[in-house]
């Protein structure tokens, strides 16, 4: 069972209860999260699930705030804590041309990941796409309310990002 959509940690009571029930039934659980939550909750959830999928959107805290609505210090601190716990996790990085796929951000992200304690995590690049745009239109909701210029990264940009990570000793795959 994968818990995702919005931020599952914002529904902590239900999430904890469901993780406990799944564990009793030997059902594998994954929590897809930004880790923007109280460290005590993160520690508890990490100890109850089988895998964490953790997004890193931007290393610059001000730009992270601009694009994701929150600063990233708590997120990065929680990632470091989870890494130190030895909990299985995968770092996922959405690649968005004009937002976070630039060389500096990629180098900063790779450097951060390579500095984490414990075993080097798997890293997945998720190239931006606008598949959800049609769904938002059908539902009458706004897809990109802040009109952030978002573009799918070119193969050249994707390959450059992979090389930057590789040069930092971090293997990243493209999903």
Question: Positions of the model-derived regions?
Answer:
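Short aromatic/hydrophobic-glycine micro-motifs
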Residues: 27, 141, 170-171
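A structural motif corresponding to the C-terminal lobe/cap of the Radical SAM core domain
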Residues: 111, 117, 121, 136-164
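Radical SAM enzyme core and accessory elements
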Residues: 167-175
């Amino acid at each position: 069972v994968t818990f995702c959509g919005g931020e599952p940690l914002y529904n902590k009571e239900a999430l904890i209860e469901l993780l406990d029930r799944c564990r009793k039934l030997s059902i594998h659980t994954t929590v897809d999260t930004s880790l923007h939550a109280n460290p005590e909750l993160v520690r508890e959830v990490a100890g109850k699930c089988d895998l964490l999928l953790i997004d890193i959107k931007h290393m610059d805290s001000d730009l992270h705030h601009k694009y994701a609505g929150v600063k990233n210090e708590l997120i990065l601190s929680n990632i470091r804590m989870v890494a130190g716990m030895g909990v299985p996790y995968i770092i996922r990085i959405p690649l968005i041309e004009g937002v976070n796929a630039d060389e500096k951000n990629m180098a900063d992200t790779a450097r951060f990941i390579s500095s984490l304690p414990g075993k080097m995590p798997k890293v997945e690049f998720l190239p931006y796409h606008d598949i959800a745009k049609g769904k938002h239109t059908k539902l009458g909701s706004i897809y990109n309310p802040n009109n952030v210029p978002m573009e799918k990264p070119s193969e050249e940009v994707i390959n450059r990002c992979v090389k930057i990570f590789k040069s930092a000793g971090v293997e990243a795959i493209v999903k």
